[in-house]
Amino acid sequence: MQTPYEYRAQAREALQGRWGEAAIVSLIILVTAVLISVPSIVAEWAGSLTTVLSVLVLPLQYAYYISLLERTRGSEEELTRFTLQYAINQAYANTRFLVAGLLIMLLSIVAAVFTFGIGGIIVKYMYIMVPYLLHDYPELTPREAMKLSREMMSGQKWELFVLDLTFIGWVLLSILTAGLGMLFVEPYMSTARAIFYKDLKEEKLIEETDETISTTAE
């Protein structure tokens, strides 16, 4: 595995010439999330409806993460087009992404409630590799992808957390731009995580064939 600064450098290289595209997708996801939250703002009783609808944003977010992953693999396709096409043709059409997102959200909420929020953070990092695994291994079910993510992140959650912490300066600076800076910081972080996934996959699964992975995840 590499240092956080090496991951950040590779993320910047992958996003070279694509920052604008990445920011546009971030904006699309942000606007979608805001629109979904409107019912709870208008009427207090609609809070539960907002929670349900927020699950529908997850496949779009997953499609975004995958577009950045493919960018690190050399894809030249425009990020906005890739994200929207993947969301429509894969993430929403294939219920695996929606089911996985729902399960992870429920586990995060339960863990957060009983551990004052700490458990929710742990669950987040435990299952953070799920969208990448569902993409790379179409034969995996949501449960199998979650199991494999747990195994991959065993002993690696702190390392990824530290990588995320190195972006704190950029996050704080984005406050000075009324949060607009996050449209660029978010893809920067997500691309670094995608590269982290690639390294972790190679390190943990290098001796595994796709057939073996499918079998052991059952």
Role assignments for model-derived ranges:
Residues V38-A43:
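Juxtamembrane "helix-exit" motif on the non-cytosolic side of transmembrane helices
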Residues I24, T32, S75-E77, W170, ...:
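Hydrophobic alpha-helical segments
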Residues E203-E218:
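Cytosolic juxtamembrane C-terminal amphipathic helix followed by a basic/polar low-complexity tail immediately after
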Residues Q2-A33, R81-A111, V123-I175, E218:
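Interfacial aromatic "cap" segments that immediately flank transmembrane helices
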Residues A33-S37, R71:
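Short regulatory "switch" loops immediately downstream of catalytic or recognition motifs
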